[in-house]
């Protein structure tokens, strides 16, 4: 029964998954109709050198997103030092750990080493600052021409508002409808890591497969708006009374 499910709310979180193409232009579109949960992950030392203690000390905050690009400065990622400290703690604990706990600790050490290497080499989207969506693993990076790739452009529609966004990460196969904290709070100022902006299946995610820029990089907010407007025009344009949101770059120098 539903009462036995871990999360009854997400038992039914998808109204539509539609693959279509506009006949006049051939522009492919993946349309997801769902709710919106909040994802709060990501970091980028090049654009944001410091993060709050609640993030630095969090055991749950994920420092990376699937959409990433090579670091462009020598500024360290703010989460690098906490992860290095975590790795040192795991190694110290391993020295005196009973045999039954060593396997799990070695897995934690391996994971921490991979994260540290990523933080040294790459930058990522930041949920609090960048508007992006999360697509289920079973949908993204598949062989279908309608399957989105990381960095593809998307437009999120809630009511009469249209929000430009990027496909920034992949989530569980069983979960549809996730947006970054920046996107969520623009839709509903009361949204937070534990409070979704939209609970009903009234959010349209228009994803444009194959639209990602040739070279990954930090979001260019002017280009984000312009490109999403172009893509919307390729599927017939916006209806009367609808407006495309213009994001402000909160991390601009």
Predicted regions and their residues:
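Soluble periplasmic/extracytoplasmic beta-strand elements of cell-envelope proteins
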Residues: 132, 166, 204-206
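Intrinsically disordered, low-complexity linker and terminal regions at domain boundaries
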Residues: 190-204
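Short beta-strands and strand-coil junctions in structured, solvent-facing domains, enriched
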Residues: 142, 173-175, 193
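Short, solvent-exposed mixed-charge patches
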Residues: 242-253
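Short, solvent-exposed secondary-structure boundary/capping segments
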Residues: 173-183
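Short beta-strand-centered aromatic/proline hotspots
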Residues: 163-172
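Short Gly/Pro-enriched loop/turn and capping motifs at secondary-structure junctions
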Residues: 172-174, 212-213
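Cell wall/extracellular polymer interaction/catalysis modules
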Residues: 1-161, 186-191, 208-243
